[in-house]
Amino acid sequence: MGKISSLPTQLFKICLCDFLKIKIHIMSSSHLFYLALCLLTFTSSTTAGPETLCGAELVDALQFVCGPRGFYFNKPTGYGSSIRRAPQTGIVDECCFRSCDLRRLEMYCAPLKPTKAARSIRAQRHTDMPKTQKEVHLKNTSRGSAGNKTYRM
């Protein structure tokens, strides 16, 4: 089995073959258009290599991908799985020094937090209802005294 070429490479090969078959001085405008299109496709695909994300661009990409969940700069690991751990690679190692794809970015998103289900009014307890203002009972400070006589209890 042969190696599968990319589409721009195949188009370039086809265009190059067509170009060699046709004499330059009798080339029609449609052939020139297709040749130019093939050359542009080939050159733009070879110059645009894999991109890396660093600094603010990396943070912006993570915020876009993860949304309100948030993200980690290091991969989250289990608690105390082993005393000695191998050095971890973070998102900067994977996406700034090398190129990374969308799936790699999603690996650093925080997990979804479960949302609290809104309770219906029927399910609420009576203590959840707003309290009405109660009568204020003043403490009887004159306990044990009647008139000007003081009694001890």
UniProtKB/Swiss-Prot annotation:
GO cellular component, one term: insulin-like growth factor ternary complex
Residue stretches of biased makeup (Basic and acidic residues): 125-138
UniProt cross-references to CDD domains, sorted A to Z: IlGF (cd04368)
Expression triggers: Expression in the bone oscillates in a circadian manner and its expression is negatively regulated by CCRN4L/NOC.
Propeptide segment residues: 119-153
Keyword Disulfide bond listed: yes
Disulfide pattern: 54-96, 66-109, 95-100
GO molecular function list: growth factor activity; hormone activity; insulin receptor binding; insulin-like growth factor receptor binding; integrin binding; receptor ligand activity; transmembrane receptor protein tyrosine kinase activator activity
InterPro entries: IGF-I, Insulin-like, Insulin-like_growth_factor, Insulin-like_sf, Insulin_CS, Insulin_family
Region described as B: spans on this chain: 49-77
One annotated GO biological process: positive regulation of insulin-like growth factor receptor signaling pathway
Coarse class of the protein's main subcellular location: secreted
Biased composition annotated in UniProt, kind: Polar residues: 139-153
Subcellular location: Secreted
Cited Pfam families: Insulin
Alphabetical UniProt keywords: Disulfide bond, Growth factor, Secreted, Signal
UniProt region (A), positions on chain: 90-110
Family under the similarity heading: Belongs to the insulin family.
Assembly description: Forms a ternary complex with IGFR1 and ITGAV:ITGB3. Forms a ternary complex with IGFR1 and ITGA6:ITGB4. Interacts with SH2D3C isoform 2. Forms a ternary complex with IGFBP3 and ALS.
Biological function: The insulin-like growth factors, isolated from plasma, are structurally and functionally related to insulin but have a much higher growth-promoting activity. May be a physiological regulator of [1-14C]-2-deoxy-D-glucose (2DG) transport and glycogen synthesis in osteoblasts. Stimulates glucose transport in bone-derived osteoblastic (PyMS) cells and is effective at much lower concentrations than insulin, not only regarding glycogen and DNA synthesis but also with regard to enhancing glucose uptake. May play a role in synapse maturation.
Protein name stated in the entry: Insulin-like growth factor 1
Organism: Mus musculus (Mouse)
